[in-house]
Amino acid sequence: MERIGLIKPEYVWITTGTGRWTNRKSAEALAKRDAGINTSKLIEVLGLENNPVTVIGKDEFIERSSNSKHAYMYGNISYVQLGEAMNGEISVINTDDWSGVTYSTYSGDKKEVPYSEKNLILEYETFNKKLAPKPVTKTVRMARNDPYNEYCLVVAAMIIGEPV
């Protein structure tokens, strides 16, 4: 997957997905399809500027990005090991003067308050010096107990914006 460093987002759609198949490549393709991100060439983004954005849904993202041959993705694609339970979370806060997106993937028990929410609230309150609004969060969990199939988990913020 191609990569870029930083992007100034204009529109953000957060999504998650899982896939299971007999090989990694197909499991990943199914996880991307489940997340709705299988229609474009993905370009991985390593960071986002914290400018205000518009949070949108899948249909609006597809409509707004229909003229582009690629899509910017900020997130993670992970493979679940045999005997492991993996959790994925992605959160977004958007206000008139600041926005932020964080994600996390981890194995083990699911947390009552997602890591991505905690980290995003801390980032918001540190930067803005006021209480954070409640983040919008999507979570996903997948446990692998089948040695004959590969399991893949996707957490992603799909971005329409300009590289910096």
Protein language model regions, located:
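Helix-coil modules at protein/domain termini and other flexible surface or pore-lining loops
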Residues: 1-164
